[in-house]
């Protein structure tokens, strides 16, 4: 619970080009970004949206519909959550860039 790092295997985009992982690499100053191929920025500009559109085009996290239930001769209104016919919001552009969760730099304030 709480782990939000990527689970993809393979080349890590923020790995240093120096390679090696011995004691000499531990003492050396850590390079920030040295990708092997194309340069990968440490920032995230978009995210996956967490809201949904319903049939009417309304945007919300959850949708409910009112149903009338008759029990012992009494009519009662209940809310039922709608799960069908919802369209995901898709990709949302962030207002300002954020640092990628897998970027290997610790930020601190003095």
Swiss-Prot record:
Q: How is it modified after translation?
A: Myristoylation is required for tumor suppressor activity.
Going by the entry's taxonomy, the superkingdom of the source organism is recorded as: Eukaryota
In-chain residues carrying the UniProt-annotated modification Phosphoserine? 50
Q: Does the keyword Transcription regulation apply?
A: no
Keywords of the record: Cell cycle, Lipoprotein, Myristate, Phosphoprotein, Tumor suppressor
Give the UniProt tissue specificity note. Answer: Strong expression in heart, lung, skeletal muscle, kidney, and pancreas, followed by brain and liver, lowest levels in placenta.
Give the residue spans that cross the bilayer: none
Pull one GO CC term from this UniProt entry.
Answer: mitochondrion
GO terms for biological process, alphabetical? cell maturation; inflammatory response; natural killer cell differentiation; negative regulation of interleukin-17 production; neutrophil-mediated killing of gram-negative bacterium; phagocytosis; positive regulation of interleukin-10 production; regulation of mitochondrial membrane potential
InterPro entries cross-referenced by the UniProt entry: FUS1
**Covalently lipidated residues, kind N-myristoyl glycine:** 2
Asked whether the UniProt record includes Cell cycle among its keywords, one would answer yes
Name the PANTHER family for this protein: TUMOR SUPPRESSOR CANDIDATE 2
Function noted in UniProt:
May function as a tumor suppressor, inhibiting colony formation, causing G1 arrest and ultimately inducing apoptosis in homozygous 3p21.3 120-kb region-deficient cells.
User: What is stated as this protein's family in its record?
Assistant: Belongs to the TUSC2 family.
Report what the protein is called. Tumor suppressor candidate 2
Query: Lineage of the native species?
Result: Eukaryota, Metazoa, Chordata, Craniata, Vertebrata
């Amino acid at each position: 619970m709480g782990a939000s790092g990527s689970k993809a295997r393979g080349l890590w985009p923020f790995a240093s080009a120096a390679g090696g992982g011995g004691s000499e690499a531990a003492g050396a100053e850590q390079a920030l970004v040295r990708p092997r191929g194309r340069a990968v920025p440490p920032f995230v500009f978009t995210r996956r949206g967490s809201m949904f559109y319903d049939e009417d085009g309304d945007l919300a996290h959850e949708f409910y519909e009112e149903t009338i239930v008759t029990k012992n001769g009494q009519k009662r209104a209940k809310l039922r959550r709608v799960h069908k016919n919802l369209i995901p919001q898709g990709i949302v552009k962030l207002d300002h860039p954020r640092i990628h969760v897998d970027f290997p730099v610790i930020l601190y304030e003095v």
